[in-house]
Regions:
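Non-catalytic cap/lid and distal C-terminal segments of serine-dependent acyl enzymes
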Residues: 1-234
Length: 234
């Protein structure tokens, strides 16, 4: 886990949990983007945990990465850093696998996070149609999600509907590059959100599935989260 602590403001601070992608680890956001510079002036802790290749969900066979983020990481951070322990002061985001993971955790634990964002997310896990560009082998996919994740807690549409019905839906922001191989996944997912009446923001920008895109658009995510957590730059 890497943590950026604010140099401005008075504690306790809001917290942004920032999740990496499938082939990455907890160091990549710091090594590949200017996230530390972008949060200068914000009273915001940034927490970058390691999720392995686990998709931040509760595995069909084995590990519970969703609980690890929502309980273990949140409790560790709030016991050891000056983090404000309330929903209004927690947000979560990520890229690719982490984009799915951010929505999976926020929608699965809607009492914990006020907002969630996904960059270039692999969002249609619940689809029965196998994606030709899915970055997992069939064995690995089934070990994590099972053979038919539709309608389960791996299915973001299922979780979003439940959170909406309960009146605890986090604010949602999704973006994707127009040359990203996951663009159709983002378009299909947001179209289904519209059909289900789930409020969200969706943007498409020039760009591919790479760090140049994520470095640019993490700033949009910070603006989004700061608005919903009512943060003001110093």
């Amino acid at each position: 886990m890497n943590v950026i602590l604010p140099e401005v403001g008075k504690p306790p601070f809001a917290t942004f949990y920032l999740l990496h992608g499938l082939s990455d680890d907890h160091t990549r956001w710091l090594r590949q983007t200017s996230i530390e510079r972008y949060v200068e002036g914000l009273p915001l802790i940034v927490v970058m945990p390691d999720g392995g290749r686990g998709f931040y969900t509760t595995h069909h066979q084995g590990h519970d990465y969703a609980r690890y983020i929502a309980h273990d990481c949140v409790q560790f951070v709030e016991r050891n850093f000056p983090a404000r322990p309330r929903r209004q002061s927690r947000c979560i985001g990520g890229l690719s696998m982490g984009g799915y993971g951010a929505l999976r955790v926020a929608l699965g634990y809607p009492d914990l996070f006020v907002s969630a964002n996904s960059h270039s997310g692999a969002l249609m896990i619940g689809s029965r149609k196998r994606q030709k560009d899915r970055p997992l082998s069939e064995w690995e996919f089934n070990a994590i999600f099972g053979r038919n994740p539709a309608g389960t807690d791996h299915d973001l549409l299922h979780l979003a509907t439940n959170a909406l019905t309960a009146g605890r839906l986090p604010k949602i922001r999704i973006d994707c590059g127009v040359d990203d191989f996951l663009l159709e996944s983002s378009r299909t997912f947001t179209r289904r959100l519209d059909e289900l009446g789930v409020p969200h923001e969706y943007e498409e920008y020039p760009g591919e599935h790479n760090w140049a895109y994520w470095d640019e658009h993490i700033r949009d995510a910070l603006t989004f989260h700061a608005k919903h957590m009512r943060l003001k730059a110093d």
